[in-house]
Amino acid sequence: LTQTDFVNGIRFENTGDTKISLDDIRVNQLVDYEMEAVTIPEGAEDYIVGMNVCSLWRNGEHTGWATITPYEDIRPVLGYYDEGQPQTSDWEIKFLAEHGVDFQAFCWLGRESDKPIKQAWDITALDNGFLPAKNKDKMKFCLIWEAANGATPVDRDAFRNYFVPYWMEYYFSNPSYMTIENKVVFAVFGADSLISKFGTGLKAEFDYLREEVKKLGFDGAIILDCNSYRTEGSASYGFDGWYAYNWGQQGCYYEANVTLNLKAKEDN
């Protein structure tokens, strides 16, 4: 039977025999706008190309635009856009997809370590921009768990009871989430903070994540260590591979990163 519930003046109505259950409510204002069609270039399917996205441009959540406005040569193509708006994300999707980019990897920073997660930190670009965008079916997304600066679970129970369910409900279950061979793609930045906490037990937690996503119909997860210096031992912590976060002056040089890491160890 159709059921209607009212919570804080908001009406929720099911269809058929679907049961209504609520654990959190997010309300966004929907503003209609015209959007140009996305034209995927020929040959774009020959490779899978992804791009790290570091969403730092919403005033009040991070440094905002004041950091770069003095430098006109790095002014964005979109101008100083309002991050976290669907229309902004639609233009980003259009520009990226039409230049052969298949998915965006968004940084995800936790707020809580030992309690249910209500909202991540600095995630407006994904939650309020990309996910409601009209063109999101033209591009996939995945998460980079930013464990270097965001909150990390206090123990395995917190990881399994708070972090994993949150990712599954809000992201992995989304049809736009990036998969390879029906496995969700999931990266970790700042894995050292997790390794220092869990040790080789980190592998058991990642294996738990792989099993949990099967409940959503996936065949597991591909978990990547986002670093440019740890080339051995990643598998013992549960990683399937590793990659460099950036391709700047040092990020693109494997030998340079290894040398810098060895020097840092010697200095310490």
Where are these regions (language model features)?
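Noncatalytic modules at the cell exterior or secretory-pathway interfaces
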Residues: 2-12
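Glycan-processing catalytic domains of CAZymes
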Residues: 13-15, 19-22, 28-268
